[in-house]
Amino acid sequence: MNYFDLFNVVPAFDIDTALLAERYRELQRAVHPDKFANDTEQQKLLSVQRTAQVNDGYQTLKNPLRRAEHMLSLRGIELSHETTTLKDGAFLMQQMEWREALEDIQHNSDPQSSIDELYESFGEFESTLLTKLATLLISDESADALLAADQIRKLKFMAKLHDELARIEDGLLD
């Protein structure tokens, strides 16, 4: 299903999230199961299914990473259940450095400073990835779509690093 069509928004990486939220509320009002409480079982079931589609579409489009994946899936590139390994040597080296830094946090004399530095480093890197991704998603070239897929893979890795750093930070606060 094309969620951009469902929400009647222009297919783009940078979307108007306020407009998306407005369309979400409109669609929810139109298909909400309570509206069909006195209808046939088939209509009730259809309403539940449509509500699920609207909810899934909204969650997909409001999240930049999921939105980018959806854009690629509309072009025939599925990333949701893949196990493709990145072949970017520089990124792999950076991953190793970040992993080592995460492991060293608990042994640092000022762990919060290390955490703050990593958040900043992650943020800068993610910003660069998102800028590249936005540019690649504009292109109609299939090679650019494959490069966009690599950017998404990197961003997924960064999300995992963020989660791990947050867990470490929470553990230090306990």
UniProtKB/Swiss-Prot annotation:
Family annotation (SUPFAM superfamilies): Chaperone J-domain (SSF46565), HSC20 (HSCB), C-terminal oligomerisation domain (SSF47144)
A Pfam short name: HSCB_C
GO biological process, one term: [2Fe-2S] cluster assembly
GO cellular component: iron-sulfur cluster transfer complex
All copies of domain J, residue ranges: 2-74
Source superkingdom: Bacteria
Keywords: Chaperone
GO MF term list: ATPase activator activity; protein-folding chaperone binding
InterPro entries: DnaJ_domain, HscB, HscB_C_sf, HscB_oligo_C, J_dom_sf
Family per similarity comment: Belongs to the HscB family.
Known role: Co-chaperone involved in the maturation of iron-sulfur cluster-containing proteins. Seems to help targeting proteins to be folded toward HscA.
Listed NCBIfam families: hscB, PRK05014.1
Assembly: Interacts with HscA and stimulates its ATPase activity.
Protein name, entry field: Co-chaperone protein HscB homolog
Source organism (scientific name): Shewanella frigidimarina (strain NCIMB 400)
